[in-house]
Amino acid sequence: MTEESNVNESNEASEVQEDHGSLVAARREKKRQIEERGIDPWGSRFDDRILIGDIRSRLDEVKFQKEDGTLIDLPELHEDPEQRINMRQWRSDNGPGTEIGPQVRAAGRIMLQRDKGKLRFIDIQDWSGKIQLFVGQKQVGESDFELAGLFDLGDLIGVDGRLGVTNTGELTIFAEKLHFLTKSIEPPPAKHVGMTDPELRQRRRYVDLAYNDGVLDRFMNRSK
């Protein structure tokens, strides 16, 4: 190995360490702001939640109710975005009406966030599955929407809301109330890198289970 490559690796390691430090500092600042709102950032009870896998199995309870009260089953939904139906067009074709669905309570780890101004889309996951949350400023109120701005990937949150389907055909919980459960100070591994070091994966098994695709499924299958 040349001296130049040694220098390059040293510089890269220094940059990674600096980036990690700034990410941790930002998360600690958000934790402080959460505490200022009177919320315990290290753990809160959240009783009567439903497993995400069980919530997803209740898709058949989501209906389109026409103005005359007639209930129409929704079309088949697909996990593949390329195969999803344009639900906006489907609803328009079926005439004036409203989508109805069961009230659900879920909790999970934040795996993905998308900020759309006065809307946020958040993917949460527990050991049984993953689901999208629709968080609208109008629907959850100013206080909860501001709280959502303090969320980070890896945080544990709870939600109360209505199960439904977005215009793009994705099964979603339309949030009415958010609950902050636990702050994750340590940022997750980069999605394109993950955790590949065997020793590190053993030492930080909780991270391996949470973020590496397929690890939790294999663990659950072996435990049966």
Describe these PLM feature segments.
Residues 1-224:
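Class II aminoacyl-tRNA synthetase catalytic cores and aaRS-like
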